[in-house]
């Protein structure tokens, strides 16, 4: 038995780790957050990209991706995490590709990234989807659920409302989903008088609509 296996068994017995199917996870959330903060200290954009690529090649890639995203999306307050996402999604980003974003794994990563640095996600989404023809937007299917959820978060934040709402409108005009929380439904919810799906005030939302109508 390796030293690693012995340590895993030791912390499982103490209840610090817990088994989840074929994987093992950290049980106390504060400790898990502390560990990812420590891990981030030594990450560069290149190393984060390599890490994501390794996950995507693993047999358990869906489980590993979801586990990573659940932890990483809690790092919105961490300057290192924000800077990493900003650089990772900057110029010549490997993620600036519609096929990558529309994949199950790629779209899930963006659901995590948007909680850490919505401005960086907004910038890249606008670059990829901003001028995409309707017929191409209609072909976005595999990752569409995650893309719409990511756009919801962009629409909610004041600093990314206009870009997020513009993209949501584009997807709504190229709708291919039938459930109520599709892009069309979520765009409509931005403009209700009471309990809108955004933190932006009514005046600013009205100005956005008038501007779109004029165009």
Predicted regions located by residue number:
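Hydrophobic residues within the alpha-helices of tandem HEAT/HEAT-like
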Residues: 187-195
